[in-house]
Amino acid sequence: MSYKCSRCKRDVELDEYGGVRCPYCGHRVLLKERSRDIKEVEVE
């Protein structure tokens, strides 16, 4: 799963046992990125 650090804005891939911390700046607030899927909805 891909996350983005809220301080340095870099993309971060988390390991299962690595903990929740940015490896670049050490910040602990990571934002989950939205999926890039496009959804179509029919309207009547």
Curated annotation (Swiss-Prot):
The keyword Transferase applies. One of its GO terms (biological process) is DNA-templated transcription. GO terms for cellular component: cytoplasm; DNA-directed RNA polymerase complex. It is an enzyme of class 2 (transferase). It comes from the Archaea. Its EC number is 2.7.7.6. It holds the Pfam family Zn_ribbon_RPAB4. The keyword Nucleotidyltransferase applies. Part of the RNA polymerase complex. This is DNA-directed RNA polymerase subunit Rpo12. It comes from Natronomonas pharaonis (strain ATCC 35678 / DSM 2160 / CIP 103997 / JCM 8858 / NBRC 14720 / NCIMB 2260 / Gabara).
